[in-house]
Amino acid sequence: MPVNALTNSFVLGAAGGGVEWGTVIVTVITFAILLALLKKFAWGPLKEVMDKRERDINRDIDEAEEAKLNAQKLEEENKKTLKQTQDEVQRILEDARVQARKQHEEIIHEANIRANGMIETAQSEINSEKERALADINNQVSELSVLIASKVLKKEISEQDQKELVDKYLKEAGDK
C-alpha cells in the first residue's frame, strides 16, 4: 500500500469512513519491529558511540584540568625557586660586601702595624746612632782632655794660650 493510501485511510477513518484495522495492526507491528531493530542495531551502537565519546570528552577535560593544575604548580614552584635564588644571590652579595669590608680593615690594620713597626725600628736606629755619636763625642772629648792635660803638664801655659789650645783641639775634633 502506498503512503498516500495509508494517509488517506487515516484521514477517512477520522472523518468517519471506517478504519481498516488490519492495516493499522500491520503498521503498528511493522513500526514496533522497526523500533526493535533500530534499538538493537542502531540505537545501542549509537548510544555506545555517544557514551564513549562522552567518556572521552570527560577524560580529556579531566586531563586538561589536571594539566592546568600541574602547570600552575610548576609555575608556583618556579616562582618559589626564583625567589629562593634571588634571596641566595642577595645573601651571597651581602656576604661578599661584609668579607670585603673585613679584608679592607685587616689590610689597613696590618699596614698600620707594619708602619708602626717601621717607625719603631727607625726610632730605635736613630737612638742607637745618637748614642753612638754621643759615645764618639765623649771619646773624642776624653782624648782631647787627656791630650790637653798632657800638654798642660808638659808646659805651663797662660790663659790666652790655653784658650787657643782648646779652640785648636776643638777645631781638630770637629774635622774628625
UniProtKB/Swiss-Prot annotation:
Assigned keywords, A-Z: ATP synthesis, Cell membrane, CF(0), Hydrogen ion transport, Ion transport, Membrane, Transmembrane, Transmembrane helix, Transport
TM ranges: 18-38
GO cellular-component term (any): plasma membrane
Gene (name only): atpF
Highest taxon of source: Bacteria
Protein name, as recorded: ATP synthase subunit b
Reported function: F(1)F(0) ATP synthase produces ATP from ADP in the presence of a proton or sodium gradient. F-type ATPases consist of two structural domains, F(1) containing the extramembraneous catalytic core and F(0) containing the membrane proton channel, linked together by a central stalk and a peripheral stalk. During catalysis, ATP synthesis in the catalytic domain of F(1) is coupled via a rotary mechanism of the central stalk subunits to proton translocation.
Assembly notes: F-type ATPases have 2 components, F(1) - the catalytic core - and F(0) - the membrane proton channel. F(1) has five subunits: alpha(3), beta(3), gamma(1), delta(1), epsilon(1). F(0) has three main subunits: a(1), b(2) and c(10-14). The alpha and beta chains form an alternating ring which encloses part of the gamma chain. F(1) is attached to F(0) by a central stalk formed by the gamma and epsilon chains, while a peripheral stalk is formed by the delta and b chains.
One MF term in the entry's GO annotations: proton-transporting ATPase activity, rotational mechanism
